[in-house]
Amino acid sequence: MVIKYLLLILVQSFVAFALPFTSRSDPKAEYLVTSLPGLYSNIRTDERPLMFAGQLELYPENQTHYFFWKYQDTNQIPEAKKRTIFWLNGGPGCSSMDGALMEAGPFRINKEGEVIYNEGSWHKSGDMVFVDQPAGTGFSYSDDYDHDLDQITVEFVRFMEKFFELFPEDASNEIYFAGESYAGQYIPYIADGILRRNKNLREGEKPFNLKGLMIGNGWIAPNEQSLSYLPYSVQAGIIKTNNPRWSSILRQHQECQDIVSENDGPDGSDVSQVVSNTCERVLNLILEATRDQSAADNEQCVNMYDHTLRDSYPSCGMNWPPDLANVTPFLREQSVMNDLNLINHKKWSECSGKVGNSFRAKNSKPAIHLFPSILEEIPIMLFNGNRDIICNYIGIEGFIKKLTWNGQTGFSEDLDTLDWVYDNKTAGYIQSERNLTVVNVFDASHMVPFDKPEISRSLIDIITGNFDEKEVDNKSDMKKKSIVTYPLGVRMAKQKEESESKTSPTSVTQSKTSSISAVSGKSLATSTTLDQEHSATPSAEAERAKNQQTSNRITRLIQLLVIVVLIWGVYILYSSYRSRPSSIIKTGPSGKKKNVQWADQLRQFEEEEIEQNEQGILSRALNKLKGGDSRGTYAPTSGKTYEDIEMNEGITEHTDNRVDDFIIESDEEDAHDENQTNKQSVSK
């Protein structure tokens, strides 16, 4: 019984060390994700993130639950600590599992329905939380659906409050929002709601530490963006002016222009709805006019999300990206739903028509009208893949020219356009001023992280100021001012080398880091440049993370070993206590007891002491686990067996005069003559 109890303590201790973030009393233990198809066979131990997922209850009265999936790197680099990034996909009504499993999350899904590692996962730069919202999207559910952006804001702020109740250790983290497409409406509205909440806190509430917004190919200003379909299509070579449908497309474009001119009031009070069917028709006509009916069925239409690709008509990109064919069955597996701790095993769909049909965005002002007030407090980054039609970069540039923020309209005319260099290659170009940064990403689609995982992750470095600004040689052998970002950990190692080289007369000038998050009004172009470019060095930070992980494992092993030794020691003491024989000698007249030991036991104790001293602790532990008799060994007797001397049971007579001796050492006799030992022979 005692052994079982001690083993139970050992197992519980091991679990406590193996899962330090959870316990029976910790509510987030219910959301811990420990298994997924392929997690242990395809993902290395050091690449497996700490994961939590589930449907978090917001309102019990109407069964509103938001599904989230959180990823945390177990070997965080210093720059990534205390940072939480909430990712939202668009739609409206499209699941953020697109972002988790096809873009910025640590996993992609292969044809076998198993997770494989994404080398460009954003969770290496901060904790990633992918949320299905509004209710009804993906794995989220409710009896009621939201109808406008104000409702969505209220519910997401409620989700954040519940989320940080579940993860109080993250409540003070720097918070960033990232997403794409219709998240260009969601994210500014939610950010505005958070900033207003922070100014009107109730008793006991704490502010959310909102630091910045990152919107990729966002649907932000419907007026200007709808007017960009035709100019972009012509510039990209998608359609030519000699197309037979050109005149009808031009007329539709003019109708869209008339709507925009009529409703785009300067004060934002009389604005067009977020989605205009008249303007949407322009894009539909372009896709119809460029259809190639002689091509294979799956290549007849231009992909509206990446014009370099083709798709079937009238899908025109709805079947893209190809990973969707793997993600959908994966998320519909009952075992996966169990792994993700789902309460309601609803059938997952990428986009919910029910949510989209319930949503009436015409009751909400387009998010662009919230930009001026948001930019007064936090930075916004707009990044665009240059191959996207539906939310193209020309539309983004168009509404920025008309936007007034922080005392000025549009970017300054003399503002430099800087190259963005990642890992010694030009990845795009950047403009930044007065808290607003625009990044055009080369060779990328509507879903930038899908096409450029590692490059897209470095966008986090830009918004957090983790970059260098310097002159770099371009293809024309001309030096051009550039923003330079690096693979994970490289910049820190580079800075360390430069710091050490400062003592040398030949050291180069260290670049000045510029942070776009500073509300100083200074652009990225005001930073000091380097005299020469440094090539990227191997990631010392990666080696540091590896060494730290090894150190953590050794520490954990030592802690576990200490527990084992302590339990073993307790067991030894307990066994010794239970095996100690009771005294069979009465006390003397003075009340002192006589110490009794078998004579041969004394000899054996001496031998055992010598033997045990020669053994190591591991050998003695193994001997103990083998179950040796802790009571000692008695010398054999001749004749009939004597059994229980203490209980006086089963004792039989001897026919042999040879008996075992035991020694009686009297405390009284020792007091009388401490130099003499009296020995006395006693018959059993």
UniProtKB/Swiss-Prot annotation:
Compartments reported by the entry: Golgi apparatus, trans-Golgi network membrane
InterPro entries listed in its UniProt record: AB_hydrolase_fold (IPR029058), Peptidase_S10 (IPR001563), Ser_caboxypep_his_AS (IPR033124)
EC top class named in words: hydrolase
Known catalytic reactions: Preferential release of a C-terminal arginine or lysine residue
Record bears the keyword Signal: yes
Region Disordered, annotated ranges: 494-549, 647-684
Signal peptide, first to last residue: 1-18
EC number(s) recorded for this UniProt protein: 3.4.16.6
GO cellular component: membrane; trans-Golgi network
Example GO BP: proteolysis
Membrane spanning stretches: 557-577
Active site residues of this protein: S181, D388, H446
Function: Protease with a carboxypeptidase B-like function involved in the C-terminal processing of the lysine and arginine residues from protein precursors. Promotes cell fusion and is involved in the programmed cell death.
The protein's name in its UniProt record: Pheromone-processing carboxypeptidase KEX1
Organism: Debaryomyces hansenii (strain ATCC 36239 / CBS 767 / BCRC 21394 / JCM 1990 / NBRC 0083 / IGC 2968) (Yeast)
